[in-house]
């Protein structure tokens, strides 16, 4: 037990939070009995009308009616007061927005009245085949309490009636037909509850050399630890023994823990006579609706995912899809599709319908049609999700990673066209960037680690998620089956969130900017060289390796489709050529411009900031030089010089009582002359650079700077204490103008005096030559810094 406690104490610093939610649709749908309109249990005069067939080639938008009943008939009764009421309103708002999006995409026609389940209300039926009421209800179930759909009680007003039949003759009506729900094609029941599925997640550990009992004990302890903190463990966690010690160490740099695990789940409950879904229920996990970590957009996208399951994107419903060769408006020609899914020679389950296969081929840039779209490997032969390796970012993959990174993609909409129940407005599709134009080999386990596609990565470094909205870590998960990609982190690494920026006064040597129009770029920019670093230039780095760069957040601005420019803190806008590396004025290092990732959609291009975003007005620029004196005969190598420069910089920042955001590009010569450029970075809190410059001058004149480095003491020389260069452009221009005016006045005066002397005296000797005073400009070039 001590071992477990030690492990749990070591665990928190290594946690890498990943904001992801998984879908439980397959196991949920299996628990629900699908009802179709049965042979009527009522006389013909009392029967409800069946679904009206479309009479037009222009079907109307799908009419979805949501019904929030607030019942408590299932496990996990939920208190609707206080936080619960707020969670319920969030759920209903998400349902309204999600159904509005669907209504603009899918279209059918017809009224709606739901069926009752004879197995629920009827205890026995007539079994004599010769009886006129054969298989009709002969004995009612005394415990019948009505119909429900995934725990939501269906009102009698939404249901057909039922009757008790004698062996011969007319029935005794028990419950007449309800009025039904007018102008509705699909009924969605909404529940908010605490259920067992909301907490359903398991941990499996791989601990080589450990007994099964020890692994089970550790699993239970880790699960308990995670759940007490509101997290749920992902299914796989590997530990290994370190030498002969009994204390396990982590096999990788992090343990992935997610929270929340399940936002919502849904199922279809009833079908019409052509197997089209008529009703379903979505259950929201109450504890997550009040979580600040989930935005309204997140809940809407999670709702949309579950709603599409209930409308037919389900392994349980694929076999019921219809083939309508004459088009949607002639339903009498429709039949059940003979082949919707199949397994290939490697056992991969594929959805093989025509529109889906063509849509995938178009997405990958393959001519003709693909052999089908891979479905996620799940328990059994049924799967209700796209394979994550191939369609990462699609709304219908098995894990949800936030609204910002999820798309209602063309391939998913093509699936609904193939269902035969709906017509699809393809203009509502959102572009899926993952794998676009990558060819038929993309997304295979055998190719994802070969470096053939930059959508995947190798190793475990930090970089950028493929949408470039977030920084990410190169990692895998069970859905990727060994393939690795830059997965977003949840520790304030979203570049588009301004609140993730650096606090006031904190040094920002890489010049990062967090802003709604910021994106993640692979870069190694720095405003100051650390000991051992060397400035890199494109000419010296013809093949820039991914390992040399990290994900950094910088401002971007679209200038056209696929064209953009970038801005680093304190720099001007710089054109970013896709597929190239660029340098940024004022910074050492390089920035890589991704190709085919940014400014690809009309939405991106329309988001151009006009006028360009201005973060702050640049402060004046100064150059500060100090001549140091060291021990007699003491010499420094190159690395020692760089170390001393860094030590002097730290001492200066300490002396000025400010952060390093005022000091840039420190250097030192072999003759021990230290030089640093002074300018105030945007976001840097404190006095103006001119005030700091003056204060440092006065302070160092009173008390020389002392630095201890490499076993030796260095001090500034009193006689050569400070040499400054003012780089304020306006002041420089003013001084130049005044100097020129003074020179002209002197020249005019000299010429006038000479002329007067010539006229007043005889030219007995040449006039004395006049040497005008030389004007020394105070402008000193600042390498790597643009003068403004």
Swiss-Prot record:
The keyword Glycoprotein applies. Its EC number is 3.4.24.-. The chain crosses the membrane at residues 736-756. Residues 21-735 are extracellular. It comes from the Eukaryota. Its cofactor is Zn(2+). GO terms for molecular function: metal ion binding; metalloendopeptidase activity; peptidase activity. PROSITE patterns: ZINC_PROTEASE (PS00142). Gene3D superfamilies: 3.10.170.20, Leishmanolysin , domain 2. Zn(2+) binds at residues 305, 309, 385. Changing residue 324 to S: In HTX12; uncertain significance. It is an enzyme of class 3 (hydrolase). The active site is at residue 306. Its main location: membrane. Glycans are attached at residues 333, 425, 491, 524, 713. It is a single-pass type I membrane protein. Changing residue 389 to I: In HTX12; uncertain significance. Residues 1-20 form the signal peptide. Binds 1 zinc ion per subunit. GO terms for cellular component: cytoplasm; membrane. Residues 757-788 are cytoplasmic. Putative metalloproteinase that plays a role in left-right patterning process. It is linked to Heterotaxy, visceral, 12, autosomal: A form of visceral heterotaxy, a complex disorder due to disruption of the normal left-right asymmetry of the thoracoabdominal organs. Visceral heterotaxy or situs ambiguus results in randomization of the placement of visceral organs, including the heart, lungs, liver, spleen, and stomach. The organs are oriented randomly with respect to the left-right axis and with respect to one another. It can be associated with a variety of congenital defects including cardiac malformations. Early death may occur. HTX12 inheritance is autosomal recessive. Belongs to the peptidase M8 family. This is Ciliated left-right organizer metallopeptidase. It comes from Homo sapiens (Human). The lineage of its organism: Eukaryota, Metazoa, Chordata, Craniata, Vertebrata. The gene is CIROP.
